[in-house]
A protein has these predicted regions:
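Hydrophobic pocket/interface hotspot
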Residues: 7, 22-24, 31, 47, ...
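A solvent-exposed, acidic/Ser-Thr-rich amphipathic alpha-helical stretch
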Residues: 20, 25-76
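A beta-strand edge to alpha-helix "cap/lid" segment located at domain peripheries
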Residues: 56-129
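Generic anion/oxyanion-binding catalytic loop in active/binding sites
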Residues: 12, 40-41, 113
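Short acidic-aromatic low-complexity motifs
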Residues: 1-30
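A short, structure-level motif marking secondary-structure boundaries and short turns
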Residues: 4-5, 40, 87
Length: 129
């Protein structure tokens, strides 16, 4: 698979579980995963277990239908950028949001070594209030 195909596989599976399995298949053990400053889950997490605990589990338990809708991808050598839109409804407040987002993935030898998120976090934070 190409780097672009690997990254696409983490978004475009038939189910969230399939996307998660694809992510687990292609990440290095010590992946560096950065959620943007100002985002509710901001920080850098090392290793898929930490990412799952601090990001994915929270997204699944705190939001209704939280998702990333890819608009397009740009690939160059060892980097792939996916950009599009986040949507979801915060369970506690019942408020929905839409936010533009870009994800920068870095790969080495067909393995994902890092992920960095850039997002308009204001609309996400507004849904929390």
């Amino acid at each position: 698979m190409t780097n672009l195909e690997i990254v696409k596989s983490t978004y475009e599976g038939k189910t969230s579980e399939e996307n998660g399995r694809n992510l687990a298949k292609y990440v290095v053990e010590d992946i560096s995963w950065t959620e943007a400053k100002g985002f509710p889950y901001a920080g850098t997490y090392i290793g898929l277990e930490n990412v799952t605990q601090n990001v994915f589990n929270r997204l699944g338990s705190e939001w209704i239908d939280y998702k990333f809708i890819p608009e397009d991808y740009v690939a160059s050598d060892d980097k792939v950028v996916a950009y599009g839109t986040y949507t979801g409804t915060y369970k506690i407040t019942g408020k929905s949001f839409t936010a533009r987002v870009a994800h920068i993935w870095k790969l080495k030898d067909s393995k994902i070594i890092s992920f960095e998120q850039f997002v308009d976090s204001q609309t996400v934070n507004d849904a929390l209030k």
